[in-house]
């Protein structure tokens, strides 16, 4: 007998669900091609085999009653209680919540702490935040349905477990004190320093900014470079643009609180990393030279070429435009077609209307329609097809 058969009769199913072998009963409980009766559900949820009970709980083929949930959250086997804690199709009663949050099994307590369809009492919050297990404390620190007291915040920010500390640092419902900020920004653990650098509830002092931008950890330096609540000085800009780590250079290249020098522009446009060349191609605080334009339009990376095709502070040559039309990436071709500083010839239009990509053909039809509407003609046109 195969469980892939969709045509089992009600008698087959009932026989399987009442088999003397618990393995068979479990397999039939997992059989997806039938709607169980109330009698079958109740019998499955009270089966002597915990494996069968789990199969029924996880089957999600019924809406449990309050009595069934009550019985499930108090089941003698922790795996069954865990399966009930993971179900999302019931709103637990206060009594059921309390039973789950005080379960002797760690995974069950964690799962209940992560449920979001109940509002915990202050006592439950305090008990969860002081649980002996760090995973439970972290789960409670990540809940957003309670307002922590200053004492709870301080205790969380100094928790012995770094993941619990990070969870508290990422909360946005408390105002950090200057002492907490300074302590966090100088923490010996770099991931804690990053988390504090990402908080937005304080304006850093110049000393804190400088210390963050020169941190030994590149991830911390990048996190500080992402902040927009300080104005960088020339030394910080130059140091950031020449950082040994490319993602730090990328963040600095995307900042808009400085005007890049010609040397910085040239260095950014020729960086070894494609993503950095893209960032610099998108900057609008410089006018590119013809050499920079040509180099960008012939870059080996298509995203760099697209970024240069989107710039409007230069007039492309007809050779550059024709090269853009021959790009393999249709998105780059469409960028060129949307430019307003190119006069397309009759040859371009005729060739474009035969393009194998439908989106490009439609774009050429729009170009042609605009010419008709404006009574203009292509540079070498003698007759135009009707669209």
Describe the function of each predicted region:
Residues 2-387:
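Alpha-helical scaffold segments
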